[in-house]
């Protein structure tokens, strides 16, 4: 079981609850973070979170997680479709991660169909609304082991 999880939310996710609620729902980012924190607490998992609209800030936080975090749950937002830098950071720190998207990116505009992260992710969850975060944490808790322990 993962003992520590870093939740990363990328650009524009600070607008959850007000930005295009017909696509992203009415749940706010503080509600998502509180729910994730409570879930991790129930599972005895150390939880941390960052949201930034700046790619470099997210990359720096991923670098800081190296050796300190067992798993990353990431909703990269629009960086999904554009950021080789984010991909390289995740691969470079060798921390297993689960990619989350609130909407089903494959039912949206064609430019949203490609992810620079998916082929490196342990799992990809999309289209489940904010429940996707809960599912990602549950997956990480059950299937991602701390370094040095055998993976399932």
Swiss-Prot record:
Residues reported to bind substrate: 75, 81, 88, 102-103, 112
Keywords in alphabetical order: Lyase, Quinate metabolism
Lineage top rank: taxon: Eukaryota
Recorded catalytic activity of this chain's protein: 3-dehydroquinate = 3-dehydroshikimate + H2O
GO molecular-function terms, A-Z: 3-dehydroquinate dehydratase activity
Keyword Lyase found: yes
Pfam family, one: DHquinase_II
GO biological process: 3,4-dihydroxybenzoate biosynthetic process; quinate catabolic process
Subunit structure of this chain's protein: Homododecamer. Adopts a ring-like structure, composed of an arrangement of two hexameric rings stacked on top of one another.
UniProt family annotation: Belongs to the type-II 3-dehydroquinase family.
Protein name, UniProt field: Catabolic 3-dehydroquinase
